[in-house]
């Protein structure tokens, strides 16, 4: 069976990625052949005895810039290995990663993720990429964490990766209404005086579903009201927002 999602990560520090990719859901998906993720060292395309992949910026300034030759050649080699792949550079200037973008990337099926480093990459490298991706308005040491976020978010949407296919649809930002997920509970039913809501122990699946929907609405209103404004709410949702447990 060929993998449903094929990814190659281009980085100066392969070991930063390999540990995460071998564990948990991603590790199992790779073992099962559902997702294929390889990590390639950009330095393999660098010149000289010391395989230098960065240099001082023209015009002066702090830090180093990733050189265009090794990075562009690494991208070209990855494209040859994954024909038709979408090449994305991790960059604070990029499109913000959200569930919609993760779904788009998962659907594409083949991705090459280029990890930025230092003060950034030589601007001429952008001629070899299709898009830039950001995971938020903050600064990281390098793009490896961002690339892993992209892989994780996209892989979860690939059929067969999650043990329960309903899991992805119930999570925060899943589906079209963009609500945060409802609170989750497990055993024991009473922990230091904090009890699991009675409705979840009732066995009444209709009431449980209504409770979960109400709680998703409540949590979203309290913590991300901007999402609630964009959500596709029904008349029943509007009634549920302020409903008590006895009204479920």
Swiss-Prot record:
Source organism superkingdom: Bacteria
InterPro entries the record matches: Alpha/beta_knot_MTases, tRNA_m1G_MeTrfase_C_sf, tRNA_m1G_MeTrfase_TrmD, tRNA_m1G_MTases_N, tRNA_MeTrfase_TRMD/TRM10
Annotated keywords: Cytoplasm, Methyltransferase, S-adenosyl-L-methionine, Transferase, tRNA processing
Classification via Pfam families: tRNA_m1G_MT
Gene Ontology biological process terms in this record: tRNA N1-guanine methylation
Location relative to the cell: Cytoplasm
UniProt-annotated binding residues for S-adenosyl-L-methionine: 116, 135-140
Group of enzyme by EC: transferase
EC nos: 2.1.1.228
Reactions this protein catalyses: guanosine(37) in tRNA + S-adenosyl-L-methionine = N(1)-methylguanosine(37) in tRNA + S-adenosyl-L-homocysteine + H(+)
MF annotations from Gene Ontology: tRNA (guanine(37)-N1)-methyltransferase activity
Gene3D superfamilies the record matches: 3.40.1280.10, tRNA(m1g37)methyltransferase, domain 2
Gene Ontology cellular-component terms listed: cytosol
Assembly information from the UniProt record: Homodimer.
Function, in words: Specifically methylates guanosine-37 in various tRNAs.
Family, as annotated: Belongs to the RNA methyltransferase TrmD family.
Protein name: tRNA (guanine-N(1)-)-methyltransferase
Name of the encoding gene: trmD
């Amino acid at each position: 069976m060929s993998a449903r999602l094929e990814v190659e990560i281009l980085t100066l520090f392969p070991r930063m990625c390999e540990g995460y990719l071998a564990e948990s859901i991603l590790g199992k998906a790779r073992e099962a052949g559902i997702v294929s993720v390889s990590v390639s060292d950009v330095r393999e395309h660098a010149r000289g005895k010391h395989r230098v992949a960065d240099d001082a910026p023209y015009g002066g300034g702090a830090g180093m810039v990733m050189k265009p030759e090794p990075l562009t050649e690494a991208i070209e080699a990855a494209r040859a290995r994954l024909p038709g792949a979408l090449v994305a550079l991790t960059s604070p200037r990029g499109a913000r990663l959200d569930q919609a973008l993760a779904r788009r990337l998962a659907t594409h099926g083949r991705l090459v993720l280029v990890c930025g480093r230092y003060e950034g990459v030589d601007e001429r490298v952008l001629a070899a990429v299709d898009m830039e991706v950001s995971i938020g308005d903050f600064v990281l040491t390098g793009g490896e964490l961002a690339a892993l976020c992209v892989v994780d978010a996209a892989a979860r949407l690939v059929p067969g990766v999650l043990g329960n296919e309903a899991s992805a649809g119930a999570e925060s930002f899943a589906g079209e209404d963009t609500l945060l997920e409802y609170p989750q509970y497990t055993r024991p039913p009473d922990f230091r005086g904090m009890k699991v809501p009675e409705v979840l122990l009732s066995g009444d699946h209709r009431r449980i579903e209504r409770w979960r929907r109400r709680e998703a609405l409540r949590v979203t209103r309290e913590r991300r009201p901007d999402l609630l404004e964009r959500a596709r709410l029904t008349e029943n949702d509007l009634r549920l927002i302020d409903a008590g447990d006895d009204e479920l």
